[in-house]
């Protein structure tokens, strides 16, 4: 402390407030003299400075850089490749010793960690888990062009690990990882015949784009990945939207020189920082051993391959017997060195025999020509209980494809650095051991299965309807039943048929075929002297050949391609020639598929799976989900359906129509339906007002049914038509911004018949649909004017005052059509004030019936032509000329026609009135017989008669009832909406 005081005098020390203002960081930083600065120490002798090497170049208007020496220095070879803000590290390591094997144990691991885009993994442990599908696919993408360039007989274990260090989301890191792996192999001491260049080509609006960004790829109809050496093609991977073979060949020829731009920077970097290649022991076959095996087995092998009657397993068994006989000979001679490589030697002899016969004769092991397709059998709708299914066979290769539709929320979530966040179409390829008659284990993700499934998925993705038109999640399962080559292309064919069988509107069928290559190479120069392109290869031809070129597409173009080769590259001209051979074979396969099913199949039967999409508001969906999702899970458990909610849409997936109806019924019971203008809905009358009635729908929604919308006829009182608790069907005619719903009942009723065109010439006063008002004082004049047709008894009947009711519209029409002046209108006979209480419908009809009886007393047979038409003029009635004498006849015919109609109306109104009266008089304790109208999830809807509905709540006896059952019930209470609640009554009258 004393030293501090000596170094800082009292004059220079600030006061307490100044200390606080300066802060701890300022004090300890040495600004006040407490912490003297320490000069940078020079680099001591012997300290190794990190030395890095870098190569930069430009490809497709973007700067690419290779860098080594800064990180991962202990690896046999390590390179960081950068493009924009995306950087990928690739490392190579190799085992020092090899183990006895006859293949190259090359492992390629590609990894994307979330730190590369500044995120923490959204997992429970917040760590990256097992490799994802995309990581496996990128590993295969790196492996396929690299593997053929290792020397023959090099069986040391090699591991390549590619890791994404940072990603800006603009470029897909897979291409960068492949080029970085090539550069890392060039820097290592591992013998390898590289380098290679890998490029991506897109096509936007007909123009090819080199190294397109992810945004550009979304609008591109081509995604081509091309790998090559300086003059040979190594690998092709294509996903496109029906691109023609001509345009695809043009894209390949453009990609080759662009990919070559990656080669020279790798060579320059290897010259600066590369290691000397080591001498590794190669497991080579001696010429002496090969000659001896050929002498013992070549003739017998050729006889097996030239016999087309052999099947796959018969041929394999015959070849195994030949190998066993050769082994016995070597064991008798005691040649242990040859015994260790004998399987490889026998396989080499097989390859020479098959290849030489196909090159010279053009025939294959099963007797086909090089361009011939195996027999095809296909069957759609193989499993009717599924959404879609198809069985496809080509030769001995057979696959079973099934389609399952799901809700949009069931789409697969993709946790990758680039690309879409979800995938709604999935094809899962499965290769079980029994398909090759082998014993094996079923594990997790298999790289081969993932790769084959993704290839078939890309082939079918181009013909699927857009998500806006078909938003459902689609899953295809491709189960290989038997395998003899090209199972992935068979999955494309079977998957296309299964999609059609599921009713999905595909744009066209997609078929796939594998094309192989057999070459005759000059040993001295390594150039190809002769070759044969083989269509629809067998599994044996895939093993013994040089190329497996899988091509899928429609009649209009290619949708997916995958090229794998075994030699160190093939010329691009041969690749382009293979495209035309594949197109011809593809058209043959499409013919077979279209003969079986050529359009989407419609739903058939009540047992086929169902899928429905319903739109609801967010508030309604929250009600459906319930607290912690209880209500949603309850519906799924009780009905067996699956409910999915996504962005205001409810999707219901059910096994059959019955399950779908049960699920929709429970959904409607909880949240009701979103009423749409023009929609017809059933509801219950909850309350009656003077101006109308309120109708309640499932879910608690209510709408107003105004009295003007009850019927086409005028309604003076709503209760005369409706009762509380009555179940009615209405149409939604209007909804406003506040959510108020207006309903109509008359919109569903038939409109009244209009006047026929034949009545246009009749007098408008005497319409059939109208009634004439007759004054009491004029009755005698009417009788006096018709002495020839009216008897004294009839006169007495006509003297009775008649009260006839007609509508205001009919009165107005009669007054407008009448020739009298407005001042000369006759007065009504009854001038007294009407009663305050309106008369009932029955009393009105009785008064009308009395008038009919008075008018009917005029016998129609006594009517003569001398009876003139009665018109009102100057307040008096007088007869007119017989030329227009249709008044009496019209009056009589009208009365007879009206009589039957009014009698029917009288009986109907009496029934309605009695029904409504009985409903209003329904009291607690009233017993009656009811019929089960509907069976709901929580109870029964009972028909009590007279269009009156009641309810019965289940008491653990849900399964005892069905629609149409007759029950004896008693009214126990009324709910808040006025609906009677009933209880069951047994035969002894007890509840």
UniProtKB/Swiss-Prot annotation:
Residues 609-667 form the KH domain. Residues 1-39 form a transit peptide. Gene3D superfamilies: GHMP Kinase, N-terminal domain, K Homology domain, type 1, Nucleic acid-binding proteins. Residues 822-838 have a biased composition (Basic and acidic residues). Transmembrane segments: none annotated. One of its GO terms (molecular function) is RNA binding. InterPro entries: ExoRNase_PH_dom1 (IPR001247), ExoRNase_PH_dom2 (IPR015847), ExoRNase_PH_dom2_sf (IPR036345), KH_dom_type_1_sf (IPR036612), NA-bd_OB-fold (IPR012340), PNPase (IPR012162), PNPase/RNase_PH_dom_sf (IPR027408), PNPase_PH_RNA-bd_bac/org-type (IPR015848). It is an enzyme of class 2 (transferase). Residues 678-746, 925-987 form the S1 motif domain. It catalyses: RNA(n+1) + phosphate = RNA(n) + a ribonucleoside 5'-diphosphate. Pfam families: PNPase (PF03726), RNase_PH (PF01138), RNase_PH_C (PF03725), S1 (PF00575). Its main location: mitochondrion. Plants silencing PNP2 stop growing after two to three weeks. Involved in the 3'-end maturation of mitochondrial mRNAs, rRNAs and tRNAs. Functions as a poly(A) mRNA 3'-5' degrading phosphorylase and is required for the degradation of highly expressed transcripts of non-coding regions. HAMAP family: PNPase. Belongs to the polyribonucleotide nucleotidyltransferase family. PANTHER family: POLYRIBONUCLEOTIDE NUCLEOTIDYLTRANSFERASE (PTHR11252), POLYRIBONUCLEOTIDE NUCLEOTIDYLTRANSFERASE 2, MITOCHONDRIAL (PTHR11252:SF16). This is Polyribonucleotide nucleotidyltransferase 2, mitochondrial. It comes from Arabidopsis thaliana (Mouse-ear cress).
């Amino acid at each position: 402390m004393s030293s501090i005081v000596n170094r800082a005098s009292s004059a220079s020390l600030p006061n307490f407030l100044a200390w606080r203002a300066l802060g701890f960081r300022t004090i300890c930083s040495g600004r006040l003299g407490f912490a003297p600065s320490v000069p940078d120490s020079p680099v001591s002798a012997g300290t190794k400075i990190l030395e890095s090497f870098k190569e930069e170049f430009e490809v497709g208007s973007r700067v690419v850089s290779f860098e080594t020496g800064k990180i991962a220095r202990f690896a046999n070879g390590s390179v960081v490749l950068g493009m924009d803000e995306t950087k990928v590290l690739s490392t190579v390591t190799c085992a020092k010793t090899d183990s006895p094997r006859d293949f190259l144990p090359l492992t390629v691991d590609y990894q994307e960690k979330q730190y590369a885009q500044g995120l923490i993994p959204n997992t429970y442990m917040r760590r990256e888990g097992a490799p994802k599908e995309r990581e496996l696919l990128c590993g295969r993408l790196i492996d396929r062009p690299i593997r053929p360039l290792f020397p023959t007989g090099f069986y040391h274990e090699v591991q390549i690990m590619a890791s994404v260090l940072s990603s800006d989301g603009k470029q897909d890191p897979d291409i960068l990882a492949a080029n970085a792996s090539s550069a890392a192999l060039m820097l290592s001491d591992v013998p390898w015949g590289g380098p290679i260049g890998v490029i991506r080509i897109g096509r936007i609006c007909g123009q090819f784009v080199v190294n397109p960004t992810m945004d550009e790829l979304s609008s591109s109809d081509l995604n081509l990945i091309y790998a090559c050496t300086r003059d040979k093609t190594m690998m092709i991977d294509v996903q496109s939207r029906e691109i023609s073979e001509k345009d695809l060949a043009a894209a390949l020829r453009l990609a080759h020189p662009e990919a070559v731009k990656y080669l020279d920077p790798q060579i320059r970097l290897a010259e600066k920082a590369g290691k000397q290649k080591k001498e590794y022991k190669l497991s080579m076959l001696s010429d002496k051993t090969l000659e001896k095996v050929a002498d013992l087995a070549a003739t017998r092998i050729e006889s097996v391959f030239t016999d087309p009657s052999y099947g796959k397993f018969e041929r394999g068994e015959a070849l195994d017997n030949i190998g066993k006989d050769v082994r016995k000979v070597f064991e008798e001679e005691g040649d242990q060195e040859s015994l260790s490589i004998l399987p490889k030697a026998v396989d080499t002899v097989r390859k020479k025999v098959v290849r030489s016969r196909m090159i010279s004769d053009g025939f294959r092991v099963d007797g086909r020509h090089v361009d011939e397709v195996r027999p095809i059998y296909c069957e759609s709708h193989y499993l009717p209980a599924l959404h879609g299914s198809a069985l496809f066979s080509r030769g001995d290769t057979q696959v079973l494809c099934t389609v399952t539709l799901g809700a949009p929320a069931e789409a697969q979530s993709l946790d990758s650095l680039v690309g879409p966040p979800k995938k709604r179409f999935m094809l899962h390829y499965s290769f079980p051991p029994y398909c090759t008659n082998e014993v094996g284990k079923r594990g997790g993700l298999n790289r081969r299965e993932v790769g084959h499934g993704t290839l078939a998925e890309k082939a079918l993705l181009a013909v699927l309807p857009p998500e806006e038109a078909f938003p459902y999640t689609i899953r295809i399962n491709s189960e290989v039943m038997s395998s003899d080559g090209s199972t992935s292309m068979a999955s494309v064919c079977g998957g296309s048929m299964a999609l059609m069988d599921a009713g999905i509107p595909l744009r066209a069928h997609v078929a796939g075929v594998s094309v192989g290559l057999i070459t005759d190479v000059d040993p001295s120069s390594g150039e190809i002297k002769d070759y044969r392109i083989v269509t629809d290869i067998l599994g044996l031809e895939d093993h013994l050949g040089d190329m497996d070129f899988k091509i899928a597409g429609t009649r209009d173009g290619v949708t997916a391609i995958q090229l794998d080769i075994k030699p160190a590259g093939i010329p691009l001209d041969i690749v382009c020639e293979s495209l035309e051979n594949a197109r011809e074979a593809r058209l043959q396969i499409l013919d077979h598929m279209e003969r079986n099913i050529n359009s989407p199949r419609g739903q058939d039967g009540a047992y086929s799976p169902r899928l429905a999409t319903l739109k609801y508001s967010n508030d309604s969906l929250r009600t459906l989900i319930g607290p912690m999702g209880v209500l949603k899970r309850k519906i799924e458990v009780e009905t067996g359906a699956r409910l999915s909610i996504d962005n205001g849409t409810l999707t219901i997936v059910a096994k059959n129509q019955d399950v779908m109806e049960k699920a929709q019924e429970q959904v409607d019971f909880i949240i009701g339906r979103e009423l749409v203008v023009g929609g017809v809905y059933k509801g219950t009358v909850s309350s009656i007002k003077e101006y109308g009635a309120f109708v309640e729908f499932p879910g608690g929604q209510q709408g107003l049914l105004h009295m003007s919308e009850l019927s086409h006829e005028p309604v003076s009182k709503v209760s005369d038509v409706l009762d509380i608790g009555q179940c009615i069907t209405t149409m939604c005619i209007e909804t406003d911004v506040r959510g108020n719903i207006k309903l109509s009942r008359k919109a569903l009723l038939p409109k009244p018949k209009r006047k026929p065109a034949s009545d246009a010439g009749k007098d408008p006063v005497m319409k059939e649909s109208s009634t004439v008002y007759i004054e009491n004082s004029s009755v005698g004049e009417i009788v006096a004017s018709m002495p020839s047709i009216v008897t004294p008894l009839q006169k007495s009947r006509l003297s009775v005052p008649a009260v006839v009711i007609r509508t205001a519209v009919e009165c107005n029409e009669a007054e407008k059509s009448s020739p009298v002046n407005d001042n000369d209108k006759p007065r009504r006979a009854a001038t007294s004030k009407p009663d305050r209480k309106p008369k009932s419908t029955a009393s009105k009809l009785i008064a009308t019936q009395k008038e009919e009886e008075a008018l009917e007393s005029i016998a129609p047979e006594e009517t003569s032509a001398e009876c003139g038409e009665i018109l009102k003029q100057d307040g008096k009635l007088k007869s007119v000329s017989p030329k227009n004498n249709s008044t009496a006849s019209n009056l009589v015919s009208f009365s007879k026609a009206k009589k039957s109609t009014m009698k029917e109306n009288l009986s109907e109104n009496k029934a309605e009135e009695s029904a409504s009266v009985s409903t209003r008089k329904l009291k607690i304790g009233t017993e009656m017989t009811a019929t089960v109208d509907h069976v709901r999830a929580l109870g029964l809807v009972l028909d009590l008669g007279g269009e009156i509905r009641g309810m019965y709540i289940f008491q653990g006896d849900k399964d005892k009832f069905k629609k149409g059952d007759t029950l004896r019930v008693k009214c126990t209470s009324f709910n808040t909406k006025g609906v009677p609640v009933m209880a069951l009554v047994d035969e002894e009258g007890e509840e």
